[in-house]
Amino acid sequence: MSTSKNYKWIIVALLFGVALLNYMDRQMISTMRPAMQIDIAELKQATNFGRLMAIFLWVYGAMSAFSGIIADRISRKWLIIGSLFVWSAVTFSMGYAETFNQLYVLRAIMGFSEALYIPAGLSLIADFHTDKTRSLAIGIHMSGIYMGQALGGFGSTVSKYYSWQNTFILFGLIGMLYAMVLILFLRDKKREITPASLGYQPNKNFFSGLASLLGSFPFWIIVLYFAVPSLPGWAIKNWAPTLIAENLKIDMSVAGPLTTISISISSLLGVIVGGILSDRWFQVNSRGRIYTGAIGLALTIPALFLMGYGVTVFHIIASAFLFGFGFGMFDTNNMPILCQFVQPNQRATGYGFLNTAGIFAGALITDYLGKSTDAGNLGKDFAMLAFVVVIVLIIQLIFLKPPKTNVLS
C-alpha cells in the first residue's frame, strides 16, 4: 500500500486521527476544571491549575528536541504508534486519579509521550508529499489538531453528565484502540538525502549534522518566528475559555465549547485556505509560503485585542474567527517553510527544536496567565500579546529569505 499513488493521502487521513487525539486528550482538562475541583480541592486555585497545565508543556518542550532527533533515526511508524498508545493509557489513568500530585505526575508523563508524535508525523507527511501538495497535506493534518481542540472543549459538557473520571477513561480507550489500527495500516518512507551536486552535503555524522542545522541563521529566524506566536497560541488554548466565561458571565460548560469550536472551525478553514494559497504562491515565488504565514499572523493581532476586551458574544466569535483563521494560515506553513531550508533527513530534528521553543513559550505564558487570572488582569494581558506578534512579523519579513533555487523538494 505504501507504494500506491494514493497512499500519500491515506497517510494524511491516518495521521489526522492521531493529531485529533493528540490535542483532544491534552485539551479536555482545560474545560473540566469546575468539575474536577469538586474532588480535587487544589484545582480551585487558578495558580495550581496553571501549574498542572504548565508541567505538561515543560516536559513536552524539553522532550520535543530529542523526539525530532529520534524520529530522524528510527522507524517513524513505531514511534508514532508507541507515542499514541502511551499517552492514551495516561489519559485512561487520569480517570482514576484522586489527588493533585497524581494528576501532576500523569500530566508530566503525557507531555513526554505526546512530544514524540508531532516531529515524526509531520516529517513523514512532508516526505510523502512534494512542494505541489505539501502545505495542503500539512494543513489537512493540522485540521485534525483543531478538531481535537474543538472536541476537547466538550470535555466540560461530557463530564457534567458522565463525570470527569469516565470522560478520561472513555477517550483513553479510544486512543489505545486506534493505535492497533495504525499497526495494520501505517507505513514509513525511506528518507532521501539531497545530492551533494545540488550544493548540500549529506551529514552522516550526527554531531556535524546537528552543528550544521544549529549553525544556520535562517533556522534560528524560523525558530523565533515559530516560538513567539506560540505565546498567544497557547494562551488561547489554555485560558480563553476562562477569559470568556468571566467576560460573558457564563458557565464553563458553555464557554468551553463556544471558545474551542469557534477557534477550531476557523482554524480548519485557515489551514485549508492557507495550504492551497501557499502551494500555488510557492510555484511562482519562493517566498510564497512565508508571505502566506505572515498574512495569517497579521490577522491574529486585532483578534487578540478583541478577545481581551470583548464583552459580547459577537466580540468573542469575531475575535475567535480572526485568530483561528489567521493562526491556521500560519500553522500550516511552518513545516513547509522549514523544508525550504533543511535537508529531508533533518526535518524531524528541525521541527523538534521548533516545537521545543514554541512549547517553552507556551509554558511561560500558561503559568503567567494563571497568576494574571488570580490578579484580575487576564483580559488586559491577552491584548498585550498582540505587540509581540507585531515584532516577530517584522523580523520574519525582513530576514527570512529562502534559497533562490529550491533543492529540498
Regions found by a protein language model. Give the residues of each.
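Cytoplasmic helix-loop-helix junction between adjacent transmembrane helices
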Residues: 106-144
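Juxtamembrane intracellular "pre-TM" segments in multi-pass secondary transporters
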Residues: 2-4, 190-222, 247
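Conserved MFS/SLC helix-loop-helix module at the cytosolic interface between two early adjacent transmembrane helices
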Residues: 62-98
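Extracytoplasmic gate region of multi-pass secondary transporters
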Residues: 29-30, 216-272, 331, 335, ...
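Extracytoplasmic
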Residues: 10-42, 236-241
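Helix-loop-helix hairpin linking two adjacent transmembrane segments in secondary transporters
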Residues: 141, 145-189
